[in-house]
Every structure is written in structure tokens, then in C-alpha cells.
Amino acid sequence: MAEPLKEEDGEDGSGEPPGRVKAEPVHTAASVVAKNLALLKARSFDVTFDVGDEYEIIETIGNGAYGVVSSARRRLTGQQVAIKKIPNAFDVVTNAKRTLRELKILKHFKHDNIIAIKDILRPTVPYGEFRSVYVVLDLMESDLHQIIHSSQPLTLEHVRYFLYQLLRGLKYMHSAQVIHRDLKPSNLLVNENCELKIGDFGMARGLCTSPAEHQYFMTEYVATRWYRAPELMLSLHEYTQAIDLWSVGCIFGEMLARRQLFPGKNYVHQLQLIMMVLGTPSPAVIQAVGAERVRAYIQSLPPRQPVPWETVYPGADRQALSLLGRMLRFEPSARISAAAALRHPFLAKYHDPDDEPDCAPPFDFAFDREALTRERIKEAIVAEIEDFHARREGIRQQIRFQPSLQPVASEPVCPDVEMPSPWAPSGDCAMESPPPALPPCSGPAPDTVDLTLQPAPPASELAPPKREGAISDNTKAALKAALLKSLRSRLRDGPSAPLEAPEPRKPVTAQERQREREEKRRRRQERAKEREKRRQERERKERGAGTLGGPSTDPLAGLVLSDNDRSLLERWTRMARPPVPAPAPAPAPTPKPSSAQPTSPPNGPVSQSTAPLQPAGSIPGPASQPVCPPPGPVPQPAGPVPAPLQTAPSTSLLASQSLVPPSGLPGSGAPEVLPYFPSGPPPPDPGLTPQPSTSESPDVNLVTQQLSKSQVEDPLPPVFSGTPKGSGAGYGVGFDLEEFLNQSFDMGVADGPQDGQADSASLSASLLADWLEGHGMNPADIESLQREIQMDSPMLLSDLPDLQEP
């Protein structure tokens, strides 16, 4: 055999010395790697869609490790959908089980903020050749990752609305005892109407009710590292819905700053970033760490104090940071739940308990705990497909009109149709004036007896006497005949009109459902405001009758305001009046001691108990001069401003309503309040000409109407003019396989994520990237640590039978 080898070398003409033959295995290994890479790409990037004549494929949205998703159009209705193809779905047990799990969960869920299955294509090939699964889903133009990391405007209202929809869907999911485990922006699908749907349930699990289920929970765990909860990284063995709330907090922070909150390069770096913000975990958390080396590593670090969220996100909304702080806690039990987060003041604008449903019954994960073979999983998936179509056909039969009137056109209507007409002379005469009773005798058979000659029954067998005014038998017969005649005429004129099947109902889009919910919420708020308005009117009438003895002169009458806004407006009205100096330090001329009611000049002190009785604009000029200074310029008070005139609380309200420019926010003195008027001039000097007092009342009413209007309106955030194209990750196709395979086979993983690749390699759904990025560590140690914290990779290349060992 040595001869042919030498001849082969001679034919090659390389002329290399025999010592260079050692490089041949390297060349062979590289060829095997290239072959395996080409094979994996061919198996995963199979974009040939065999969907029959019902759907028309438009374009490919994205592809990944688990499948390919394309947009399509249904030929019958023109509706656009997304079709996800899972090629070779039964080759790997892990991927087959993932497909079965996702089908079962999505069939169980029916929620506006969760991706829904519209159809599952039946296999068109024999059972033995069935390999690819086609699932028809809602079509969403983009995902939240593309929105955040693009030039698309993202306001605080967008963030609030996205977060509300995410928590609304999460509340429904958690009520079914389902934990998503892989929430990230690319798994949240978004359309141009700012509607959000949660997708990719392939890694979902149920709640762990016993320690024996912890291993099941961590099986095939693939949470993206940047959104991974601490209990999963530290192996705290406390796996609850709080895992998803941590991911929601990371997504929330990413929306606020449009950058990732904890972009760790590897496992250790991820822990460091979390502790830099949240500080060192409590001793209880450290003692609960399941991995000994991880516990020793955390204890070796110097203690750190938590950083205030105002420092992490300077200038962000305080209520938003309050909610963010309640989501991101080391202790899972200390995190806020989805239901409680919906009640947070930051989401009060959209919160509606009647429109935030729960899921019943809970989802059953019993099938997922069984050790299933590929053949059993295939049988289960085929059974799920048939069950989906059986349910849909059953629903169609329930809503379809039954053809109960169809036989009427060809068959006799009923025996009553042959009754004689009510206008027949013989029948009516016999019934109204029956002949005298005849003696019983043998006559013809009962079926041949003439009704007109039959004797009347005895009096004892007659029906009870009819009440006066009741409908007679003749009238009943006439009505019956008229109805039957009308029915026959309708059948004769248009026999197919009542039998036509109703035209198919136009499918209701998600946007129409959202409009219905907003209209329902608006009507509910209007009814609540009307009730509050009537209650306030009753209170004003009672207060006016008890104090003034006449009709109320409240300028806020008829307007709907909350108690807080009303109190602030009343304080503002008092501040709009000329300030009253304190009696003690007033340098005004001394009043006459002999007067029972001393008068004072315009700048003199006024009793504080008399000031709030009437607004400044309603006091007559001559009569009110001894009590209140004249309207117009506001004099500078000689003493300190009384406590009720402090303007700090009202400043925040007025600024938040955008009624005044920011430049009108100086100190808290009473003369500084005048710039807050929407149309008023700057505060005049005491020596200038007085302004008429009637100009103050319209300003207060205008502000009141604006505040009242803001209590009723519930505007949605502006729609997106153009959404960036999504990657398809939210449909559960997995991470970008081409880039991942190139990096994995070349062993050329960079130290960190490259620019423009924020959601690909570093956001892959496998811990294999963590192992490859662990520079400076022995691979055996990394694998040992991975086993210790019970986190396995779902993508085992050895499961593929076609791959060759290099």
C-alpha cells in the first residue's frame, strides 16, 4: 500500500519531503469541518415552502437554527400571515420536543398580546415521508430589538405602551402556570400600530413544585445571557415567574436608554455587571448559591453598594425608575409580579382590570416530563395537527346556520296546511251553531265519519269555559292560515333567499380589537367621570347652601377634576389673588383705634380668615377696598409669605401639564407665581398701571378645562411611520445559525459583540457562546462549572447522524 501512496505524491508534483506528510490529517479535518458546515446550512436553510394552493409565499422574513419563517398571503381572503417551516423536525429529539411544546402552548393560549396560531398545514405526503411542519401565525412587521436599535423615534409613551402590553400578556401566561424563560426584545413582535405580541415559546416551562423538578426545569435551558435572571446564573433552585420579571426589567431599561442594561461578554462578566448596579447580594442569597465555586467567587469580591437608578438613568421618569427598581432585585421573592406591575402608577393610563384576563385552566406540562422517542414525538405532533383541524371544523359547524329550512321547499309543509280555509261556510257554521245531539248509533268507521255531521261531545267532556275577551278558535284558525299563506308566498317568490348561507364574516384584525378595547375603556371612564361630576355637584350644593345660603359661585362647577387637581387649582386661585402680608410685620399706617372695623390702605394687612371667602375678581370695587387691596399690580409683601402661598407642589403639576414655559420656574415667593399664567404678562412693578381683575377668571377656567380634558382623554402613542424589518427570531426560528456556525467552526469568537451584531452571537440562545468566550479559563474547568450549575446546551451537534468526526 506504500507504493500507491508514493505514486500519488509523485502525481501531485508537490515534491515535498516525506516529513510533510503529517500535515495531511489537518487538511482532512478541515475538509470534514467544511463538509459538516455545508451540511448544517443545507439542512437549516431549506427555504422551499410546499404550502399548496391555499397560500402564496411573499418573501423570507428570517431563518435560524430551528426553522425558516416567510410572509405569505392567503389566496381566498388576501390576508397576510407568517408561515413558519420547521424542516427535518424529527431528526433531533430536542428540536422535535421543542416543536411539540410550542404547538401545545400556542393552541392553549388565546390572548391579544401572545402570538396566535392561525393554521397548521396538514401533511400532504405519507406518514413515513412526513418531515417538515408548517405553522401559520400572525404577521408582525418587526420586533422590539429592531425598534430599539434603529433611528425610529421611541418616546416615553411608546415605552409605557409596550411595557403595558408585555405585562398584560405575561399576566395571562403566568396565570396558566407557564414561565417563558427566554424573554428578550427580539422575541417581542411589533407592528406599525405599536401592538406587541410575545413569541417563541419553545423554551417555556411550568412551575417547579418540588425540588425533584429543578433538574427538569434547567434541562435544555437557553436563556439569553443579557436577560438571564440571577437565580439561574447562581443556581438558587428558586424557579418562579420572577425569572420572567427580571427579563422584563432588563427590556424595560433597554427601552429607556436604547442600550442593553447588562451586556456581559461571558458568565463572569455578566455577574460583575449586575453587581455593579445592584450591589453585593445579601448573605442569604450567597448562602443559597448552589455552585460552590460561584459562591466562593462572590465572597472573594469586595462589597459594593447599590447604585441609585437615578444615577444609571439620569433624567428618566421617576415612576418608571420606581417600577424598574421593583423588577430588578436579587431575591426572586422581592420582585414585583406581573399583576402588581400593571397596577403601578406608571401604567395607570392603560391599566384596566376588566381588560386584563387570566388563563383557565392552567397548562399541563405532563407530556414534557416523559422520556419520548423521536417516533413518539412525531405521532404526538401529527395528533396535535389533527386535533387543531377537528376543533376548527367543530367551531365552524357551531357558527354555521343549520339547513333546517331546506327540506321545506320540496316536502309538504305540515298536515295543518291542508286544513280548510277559515272562510269556508260549512266548517264555521258547524262550529258556531252545532246541530242538536243525535242518539248514538252504529255508523261508519271513525276514519270515514264526516266532521260536519258528527254529534257534539257531552257537556262533561267539553273544555272549561273560555274567559271573556279570549281569542276564539275561529280567530286562531284564521291567523294560522294567514301565516301559512304568507310562508308559502315567500317560498314561491324567493325559495333560496332564506336558505342562502350567510356571507363570511370579515376577519377582525388586531387593530380593530385594540380600537374596541380603547372605546370600551373610554366609555367606562366617561361613566366614572359622570358619577364623580354628580357627586361633586351635590357636595357643592350642600356646601353652598350651608355657608352662603344661596347658589354656589364655584368657578369649577360643572367640570370634572380629580381631588388632587381640584385642591391644587384652589391653591392656585388663592395665589392669583393679591398676596396678603402677615399682620405682625406689616409697616402699614396705624389704623384708628376707635373704629370697630378698622380700614387700611391698599397695602395694609388683611385678616387671613376673610381672604378665601371670595375670589378676587368677584369683589366689587368700592365696597371691598377696606377688606382687600384693589385688583391689578401685585405689591411686594413686606413680611414673609404665609404657608398656604408656597408654590412648590403646584409647580410640578403645572409643569407636567405643559401650561407654562420652563423659564417661569423661579423661586417660591408669591410674586413669582404670576408667570405661570398661560397668557399673562410678567409680574408688573408696583408702580405700574393696574390690570383689570376680569382677566384672571378666564385663565383659571382655561386651565381647569385643560386639566378636565386630560382626565378623560386616553391617547395612544403615535404609530410608527415605518418599522424596520424583523429578523424572525420572535417566531421561534432560533438564533442566526450561519453566523453562529461560522464562529463556532472557525473557533474565532471575538472578545465581545461587534458593532451591529448586538442580537446575534452574543445574544445566542445557547451557552456554547459562553464557553467559547471564556478566555483565560481551561475548557475542562468551564465544562465542569457548566455541569455544576446544571445548565446544558440544547444544540448537541453529535445528535445529527450525518455529521462526521474530524
Swiss-Prot record:
The modification Phosphothreonine is found at T723. GO terms for biological process: calcineurin-NFAT signaling cascade; cell differentiation; cellular response to growth factor stimulus; cellular response to hydrogen peroxide; cellular response to laminar fluid shear stress; cellular response to transforming growth factor beta stimulus; ERK5 cascade; intracellular signal transduction. Dually phosphorylated on Thr-219 and Tyr-221, which activates the enzyme. Residues 78-139 are annotated as: Required for binding to MAP2K5. Residues 140-406 are annotated as: Necessary for oligomerization. Its cofactor is Mg(2+). A motif (Nuclear localization signal) lies at residues 505-539. The modification N-acetylalanine is found at A2. A motif (TXY) lies at residues 219-221. Keywords: Acetylation, ATP-binding, Cell cycle, Cytoplasm, Differentiation, Kinase, Nucleotide-binding, Nucleus, Phosphoprotein, Serine/threonine-protein kinase, Transferase. Residues 2-77 are annotated as: Required for cytoplasmic targeting. The modification Phosphoserine is found at S710. Residues 55-347 form the Protein kinase domain. It comes from the Eukaryota. Residues 647-660, 693-710 have a biased composition (Polar residues). Residues 407-806 are annotated as: May not be required for kinase activity. Residues 433-443, 578-592, 627-643, 678-689 have a biased composition (Pro residues). CDD domains: STKc_ERK5. GO terms for cellular component: cytoplasm; cytosol; nucleus; PML body. One of its GO terms (molecular function) is protein kinase activity. Belongs to the protein kinase superfamily. CMGC Ser/Thr protein kinase family. MAP kinase subfamily. This is Mitogen-activated protein kinase 7.
